[in-house]
Amino acid sequence: MANTAQARKRARQSVQRNKHNSSLRSMLRTAIKRVRQSIATGDKAAAGETLRKATSVIDSVADKNIIHKNKAARHKSRLAAAVKALA
């Protein structure tokens, strides 16, 4: 239990940050799943469009330090390679 006003405030902030970060991580996972689903259908145009949107989400999450920049680069690289392989 937080004993000081500062500790109570930090506990509140931690809960708020946790909710926000969880939301962003969920958004990231959803974007990646959408790209994989469009790749599975074999539609190169749809896959390219979902990849573009997912890249934006991945970069946004990495900029906010929710995931490491190298993990973001790895996700983007692998998804782009999978979309390119559809050709």
Swiss-Prot record:
<dbReference type="InterPro" id="IPR002583">
    <property type="entry name" value="Ribosomal_bS20"/>
</dbReference>
<keyword id="KW-0694">RNA-binding</keyword>
<keyword id="KW-0699">rRNA-binding</keyword>
<comment type="similarity">
    <text>Belongs to the bacterial ribosomal protein bS20 family.</text>
</comment>
<dbReference type="GO" id="GO:0005829">
    <property type="term" value="C:cytosol"/>
</dbReference>
<dbReference type="GO" id="GO:0006412">
    <property type="term" value="P:translation"/>
</dbReference>
<dbReference type="GO" id="GO:0070181">
    <property type="term" value="F:small ribosomal subunit rRNA binding"/>
</dbReference>
<protein>
    <recommendedName>
        <fullName>Small ribosomal subunit protein bS20</fullName>
    </recommendedName>
</protein>
<dbReference type="GO" id="GO:0003735">
    <property type="term" value="F:structural constituent of ribosome"/>
</dbReference>
<keyword id="KW-0689">Ribosomal protein</keyword>
<dbReference type="Pfam" id="PF01649">
    <property type="entry name" value="Ribosomal_S20p"/>
</dbReference>
<comment type="function">
    <text>Binds directly to 16S ribosomal RNA.</text>
</comment>
<feature type="region of interest" description="Disordered">
    <location>
        <begin position="1"/>
        <end position="25"/>
    </location>
</feature>
<feature type="compositionally biased region" description="Basic residues">
    <location>
        <begin position="7"/>
        <end position="22"/>
    </location>
</feature>
<dbReference type="InterPro" id="IPR036510">
    <property type="entry name" value="Ribosomal_bS20_sf"/>
</dbReference>
<dbReference type="GO" id="GO:0015935">
    <property type="term" value="C:small ribosomal subunit"/>
</dbReference>
<keyword id="KW-0687">Ribonucleoprotein</keyword>
